[in-house]
From Swiss-Prot:
Family in the record: Belongs to the bacterial ribosomal protein bL9 family.
Lineage: Bacteria, Bacillati, Actinomycetota, Actinomycetes, Propionibacteriales
GO MF: rRNA binding; structural constituent of ribosome
Protein name (record): Large ribosomal subunit protein bL9
Organism of this sequence: Nocardioides sp. (strain ATCC BAA-499 / JS614)
InterPro entries in alphabetical order: Ribosomal_bL9, Ribosomal_bL9/RNase_H1_N, Ribosomal_bL9_bac/chp, Ribosomal_bL9_C, Ribosomal_bL9_C_sf, Ribosomal_bL9_N, Ribosomal_bL9_N_sf
Domain of life: Bacteria
Name of encoding gene: rplI
Keyword Glycoprotein: no
Amino acid sequence: MKLILTQEVTGLGAPGDVVEVKDGYGRNYLVPRGLAMRWTRGGEKTVDSIKAARASRAVRDHDHAEQIKTKLEAQPVAVKVRAGAGGRLFGAVTVTEIAGALADASGEQVDKRTIVVTNPIKSLGAHEVSVKLHDEVSAVVALNVIPA
């Protein structure tokens, strides 16, 4: 089955890639979850639009990624969240909140899909997250979670 990926699928490809997969995998997993759509002749326009959107979000090159990395790692980023009396949060800090705090602190827009949180952040204090800026460049950002 020939599919066009609409989101990144680990081990398969990036958005806009045309891939060949087994029928059951495509029909039962990728298409229902919105990770891919069936390939058609008119789908080439979709591929072009997905690749154009991805290129606009992507970091230009390795040097630009290094510049963004130095900006992000320069100082800790404060994230304000609602917390209870014992310092426990109501929920967890989301990647959307982290991306917003990074944009406010550094002035650089970071795609939330590039932020990797190894363990859910559910308490106040200092935490670390990594941001994959380029295939070869990732930044480790210090977060200070403070009560709002």
